[in-house]
């Protein structure tokens, strides 16, 4: 047994000792990677290669991974990998960090969930005051739209008995450090920053959700560019960031009916410094004519708010189940 094989073997045994019983399969892949065949065996999934995708499926879940790509789909929802799925010998592999920190927490939340129910949600309406955020061609301001959506999310969550606080309640600008510090001071159990997108091309459309990139890997929106890849306080929550991000993103896509741009990774200040599971949602593009009018309409804002609130409620339900 080569030393890297031994290390991987020990890691897998430790990781799955609870959920799967002792695993005695050797993974013959390079250190830091795990083969899709191996993952499929762990989940008792059937595997097939379909065009450029590897499909893995059991009775409960379906995972699709594009080969030589960072795109993966978990139960139909796009999740960006930190690094592309690559072939080593005969095996398609992904990085261990994407399996251990993302796919497995999403599929087996009970093995990662905190041992007590979350109590307080902090919502962070982006921008405010002198910082308007993006401005649409017709002059709609991101700071106003996201404050309105945040109030709708607050109302929906409070109707379900969940405590909610906001980093701003009016047209003010708490700086980015103040927002993370506020969440910590009030004892936030989860943090959701709410934004609207802008792009140079008016064709760009859809919704996307960000969580902190794992240490050592690029942000998905700055892939291959020079950037820091250090660990931050929020990386302690990598697994639950994925669970919260996936729950919110899948509900956001479902309710908004917009294009799915995926659950992505970025070291945004309000994510990386926040000391609880944290997510940043982009509710559509102010630079896309159709989405500009949607973002200006109360009915679309309500749908987006429902998507976010349902995602938070879904996260609460997953933790509640894991505590039984
Ligand atoms: Zn913004």
Locations of regions flagged by a protein language model:
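Solvent-exposed, well-ordered amphipathic alpha-helical segments
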Residues: 1-3, 28, 41, 45, ...
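Short, cationic motifs built from Arg/Lys/His that form the positively charged side of catalytic pockets
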Residues: 5-7, 31, 37, 142, ...
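Compositionally biased regions
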Residues: 1-4, 19, 323
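N-terminal secretory signal peptides and thylakoid transit peptides that target proteins
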Residues: 2-14
């Amino acid at each position: 047994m080569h030393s890297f094989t031994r290390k991987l073997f020990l890691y897998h045994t430790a990781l799955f000792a609870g959920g799967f019983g002792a695993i005695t399969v050797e993974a013959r892949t390079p250190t830091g990677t795990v083969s899709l065949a191996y993952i499929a065996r762990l989940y008792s999934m059937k595997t097939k290669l379909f065009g450029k995708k590897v499909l893995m499926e059991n009775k409960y879940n379906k995972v699709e991974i594009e080969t030589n790509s960072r795109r993966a789909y978990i139960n139909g929802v796009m999740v960006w990998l930190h690094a592309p799925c690559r072939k080593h010998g005969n095996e398609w592999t992904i990085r261990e960090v994407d399996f251990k920190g993302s796919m497995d927490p999403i599929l087996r939340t009970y093995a990662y969930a905190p041992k007590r129910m979350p109590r307080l949600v902090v919502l962070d309406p982006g921008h405010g005051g002198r910082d308007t955020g993006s401005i649409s061609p017709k002059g709609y301001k991101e700071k106003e739209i996201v404050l309105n959506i945040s109030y709708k999310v607050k109302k929906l969550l409070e109707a379900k008995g969940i405590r909610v606080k906001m980093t701003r309640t009016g047209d003010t600008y708490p700086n980015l450090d103040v927002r993370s510090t506020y969440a910590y001071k009030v004892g936030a159990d989860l943090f959701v920053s709410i934004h609207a997108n802008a792009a140079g091309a008016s064709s760009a459309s859809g919704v996307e959700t960000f969580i902190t990139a794992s240490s050592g890997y690029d942000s998905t929106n700055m892939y291959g560019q020079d950037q820091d890849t250090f660990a931050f306080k929020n990386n302690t929550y990598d697994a639950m960031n994925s669970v919260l991000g996936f729950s919110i993103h899948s509900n956001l896509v479902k309710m908004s009916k917009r294009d799915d741009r995926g659950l992505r990774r970025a070291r945004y200040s309000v994510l990386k410094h926040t000391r609880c599971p944290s997510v940043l949602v982009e509710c559509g593009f102010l630079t896309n004519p159709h989405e500009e009018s949607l973002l200006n309409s109360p009915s679309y804002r309500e749908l987006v708010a429902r998507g976010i609130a349902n995602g938070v409620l879904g996260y609460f339900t997953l933790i509640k189940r894991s505590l039984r």
